[in-house]
């Protein structure tokens, strides 16, 4: 990923998307012609294409320390989330779900179709761990859903104790790790895991779903065996190869990159806290290394985002789950900041100190123009 989307724009919205990581770009442009064949056929080119797809899947599995046949490529965004939740519940005799109240908007909306219980959060967007565990014990749902970290403010959730209780009660836990950008070790405290490759420099369009072998999953789509019975469609193999290649490249320098970005976020937090009327959101310590959100009291978020864009910075504003729209965030509302627009910064992998300093200057100038 690059800090600049062009000669003038610095990408401070890397969680949404950004330029391709070099190894991903190479995969898309240098693969042999057979990479574009249907991998389900029996002729030579098809078998060769299948080997490329299997290799990409295996490389992802090795990094996540799972088996290749537990890794599937699925549609990104709301379509993929719906596929996951529907597939898990379709395999269950009951339809009770426990989730946090600050999951992605698509998850919250999908859960309205089922018997769901949403667990409250504090003013940093961390769930009430005690309440979550008590509800697991009393309701005994067929599925628990919990984000690895919040998609808007970066706060990490207490995954381990929740997973431990789910294991005791034989309840599958679906962990949405789509905002970790490959920078955080997601460990093994989950039964179902979702990753978003576009956040680490792979092309937009496919997400990575990992379902452990002991977890029941029955796709709502016609099951023809493709993608480990999760998604009945041919996968664009160059994209799958790009996902695997970019994750491998990131994994080689993950610790160094995460540490560098965490320091920059700390510097940015300290600078923002000195600016009048700015409230910095999320946990200052237990957080994603590359994400920071803040709101500016009585200031329109759209105005800030547009003016920062004019000054060369791409940021996200409003609800991060709502495409191209400035709408109040359900996450901020749950945190105690109803009807407030906010700015989310998510740093690209090669963001540097000068970028942070320039951003603070641009933001200060924007506020002075109000």
What are these regions, as identified by a protein language model?
Residues 1-370:
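Pyridoxal 5′-phosphate
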């Amino acid at each position: 990923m690059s800090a600049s989307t062009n000669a003038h724009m610095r990408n401070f919205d890397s969680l949404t998307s950004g330029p391709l990581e070099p190894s991903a770009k190479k995969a898309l442009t240098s693969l042999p012609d057979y990479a574009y064949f249907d991998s389900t056929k029996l002729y030579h080119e098809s078998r060769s294409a299948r080997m490329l797809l299997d290799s990409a899947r295996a490389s992802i599995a090795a990094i996540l320390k799972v088996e290749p046949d537990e890794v599937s490529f699925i549609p990104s965004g709301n379509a993929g989330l719906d596929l996951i939740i529907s597939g898990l519940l379709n395999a269950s005799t009951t339809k009770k779900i426990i989730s946090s109240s600050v999951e992605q908007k698509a998850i919250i909306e999908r859960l309205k179709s089922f018997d769901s219980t949403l667990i409250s959060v504090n003013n940093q967007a961390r769930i009430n761990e005690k309440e979550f565990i008590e509800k697991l014990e009393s309701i005994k749902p067929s599925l628990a859903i919990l984000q690895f970290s919040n998609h808007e403010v970066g706060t990490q959730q207490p995954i381990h104790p929740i997973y431990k209780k789910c294991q005791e009660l034989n309840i599958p836990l679906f962990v949405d790790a789509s905002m970790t950008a490959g920078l955080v070790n997601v460990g093994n405290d989950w039964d179902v895991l979702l990753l978003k490759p576009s956040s680490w420099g792979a092309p937009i369009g496919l997400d990575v779903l990992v379902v452990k072998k002991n977890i029941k999953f029955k796709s709502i789509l016609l099951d023809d065996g493709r993608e480990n019975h999760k998604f009945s469609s041919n996968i664009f193999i160059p994209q799958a190869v790009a996902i695997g290649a970019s994750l491998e490249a990131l994994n080689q320098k993950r610790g160094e990159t995460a540490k560098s970005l965490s320091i920059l976020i700390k510097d940015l937090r300290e600078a923002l806290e000195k600016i009048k009327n700015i409230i910095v959101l999320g946990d200052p310590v237990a957080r994603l290394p590359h994400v920071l959100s803040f709101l500016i009291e009585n200031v329109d978020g759209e105005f800030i985002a547009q003016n920062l864009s004019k000054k060369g910075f791409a940021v996200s504003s409003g609800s991060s789950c709502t495409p191209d729209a400035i709408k109040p965030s359900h996450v901020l509302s749950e945190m105690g900041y109803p009807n407030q627009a906010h700015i989310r910064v998510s740093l690209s992998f090669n963001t540097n100190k000068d970028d942070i300093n320039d951003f603070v200057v641009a933001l200060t100038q924007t506020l002075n123009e109000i």
